[in-house]
């Protein structure tokens, strides 16, 4: 097995500090991807090149340490993971997601290629997945914190979901304490700050990707949605 976690919100919603990175790795995560909060924790610049399992967005325009795509060898299988930001509604300058993906694909000989596509627009996510045809194994959407009900094997053979969802507080607004969001977003109280709950029902969102042992073609994508260790599995029908 090989486990990927998007860790860009793990440090109180803003980026990933070294302690939280170490926490994920010690608890069985093989690869940590990021997103638009990739540099919110200043220390990430200092340690991203000292660790082997942290990937920042591939297509950011600024010069930044680290890599946006890496290959991991697991039991003789080469698995590439790429982290790409969408361009629709982006508040930070990004290079063209499609062209940057192609620049990796053109020189890629890995057995499996999984893209964490961190974007706002579900339309952009799906169009991006279709545009790559069968040149990648999976396009997994992240960023909105809400798991979508569209996990599928595209007719191109790509495993896809618009958004895998989040892990965090269940009785919340996208993982943030409810009243603090109401004050800031609904009542426009600029003095209010987002708060996070340490003691609440816990939501675990994920997907399981299944590949053929011989051809490495994607066969199935199974979403998981679990609250306090109780939940359900959405199987494709």
Locate predicted features.
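Acidic, metal/ion-coordinating pockets
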Residues: 1-237
């Amino acid at each position: 097995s090989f486990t990927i976690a998007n860790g860009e919100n793990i440090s109180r919603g803003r980026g990933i500090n070294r302690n939280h990175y170490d926490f994920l790795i010690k608890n069985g995560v093989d690869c940590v991807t990021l997103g638009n909060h990739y540099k919110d924790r200043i220390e990430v610049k200092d340690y991203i090149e000292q660790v082997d399992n942290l990937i920042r967005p591939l297509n950011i325009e600024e010069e930044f340490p680290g890599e946006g795509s890496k290959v991991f060898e697991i039991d003789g299988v080469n698995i590439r993971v790429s982290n790409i930001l969408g361009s629709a509604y982006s508040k930070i300058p990004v290079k063209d997601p499609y062209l940057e993906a192609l620049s990796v694909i053109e020189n890629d000989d890995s057995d499996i290629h999984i893209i964490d596509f961190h974007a706002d627009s579900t339309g952009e996510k799906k169009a991006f997945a279709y545009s790559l045809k069968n040149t990648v194994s999976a396009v997994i959407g992240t960023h909105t914190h809400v798991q979508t009900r569209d996990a599928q094997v595209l007719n191109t053979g790509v495993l896809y979901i618009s958004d895998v969802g989040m892990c965090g507080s269940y009785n919340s607004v996208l993982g943030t304490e409810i009243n603090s969001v109401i004050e800031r977003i609904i009542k426009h109280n600029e003095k209010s700050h987002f708060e996070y709950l340490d003691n609440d029902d816990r939501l675990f969102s994920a997907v399981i990707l299944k590949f053929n042992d011989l051809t490495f073609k994607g066969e199935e994508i199974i979403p998981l949605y679990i609250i306090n260790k109780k939940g359900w599995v959405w199987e494709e029908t």
